[in-house]
UniProtKB/Swiss-Prot annotation:
The keyword Membrane applies. This is Carboxylesterase Culp6 homolog. The lineage of its organism: Bacteria, Bacillati, Actinomycetota, Actinomycetes, Mycobacteriales. It is an enzyme of class 3 (hydrolase). It catalyses: a butanoate ester + H2O = an aliphatic alcohol + butanoate + H(+). Pfam families: Cutinase. Esterase that may be involved in cell wall biosynthesis and/or maintenance. Hydrolyzes pNP-butyrate (C4). Signal peptide: none annotated. Inhibited by tetrahydrolipstatin (THL), a specific lipase inhibitor. Belongs to the cutinase family.
Amino acid sequence: MAKNARRKRHRILALIAAAAMALVVVLVVTIVVVIMRRPDTPATPPPSAEPPGGVVVPPGTRKPRPEFQSADCPDVMMVSIPGTWESSPTDDPFNPTQFPLSLMSNISKPLAEQFGPDRLQVYTTPYTAQFHNPFAADKQMSYNDSRAEGMRTTVKAMTDMNDRCPLTSYVIAGFSQGAVIAGDIASDIGNGRGPVDEDLVLGVTLIADGRRQMGVGQDVGPNPAGQGAEITLHEVPALSALGLTMTGPRPGGFGALDNRTNQICGSGDLICSAPEQAFSVFNLPKTLETLSGSAAGPVHALYNTPQFWVENGQTATQWTLEWARNLVENAPHPKHG
């Protein structure tokens, strides 16, 4: 009799423990869902191309400029920032050869071939360009570190050029991770905190920008509605802890460069047009795979084809090439001394 009573008591305790564990799981899931679905409530007004009230932020104080610059200075510097797994810190920025199939090479290479070095210098950012998946033993650099390296390298190149050639103009373009970097630099320049003055930037084009935001910059062609994955997944602590900080909207948008910054995004590309349901905090391996671009559908890899994005018969790379060519052809001709 006593033995049966003990068994019954043990069963009751086991049921209570199971119920308590289930309650904990439900509470954790509820908290995560609330965090994921709560509306953004930043301490500062949401970033936009203009601050509230339509008052344009004045650009930073411009550096004094001479009447002429050195004879070896190019009139224009084209900054090309490749995407994930399409660059290397050991590649030659003026003659990159390690990734001949890089998407950006379809733009930068024809430009370098068309214009002489006195008119145009094409600089392809050499950086690690990786995306470590913490659920795989891939020995890759983390997205945070790769993105920061690309940013530092590009800013230094532009700063060095501006110090040596203060009258040189700039054309900036990037793809995927490179588009995030290019967009961040454009945002800094347009808001008076960048490596060069905003009036020296002829234009910016971002292909598959992970921080794309509706109403910020100029949408080109058949872009879908939506926002970049870094905005959709903003403020998800689990990703930051994994070296994948999703940085959200750019503070101040593109500022004074808003009407000179183009956004290109293919329909179905979850990197630049990411609905909330495309990612799941409960399935981080799948989310990380999508973020790396390998599971963003075929769209993310096909901007050099007309399959998912075409404007007036041109692919995204053809459109960007023509856009950049026109900017270079019509750029100022600084005096040389």
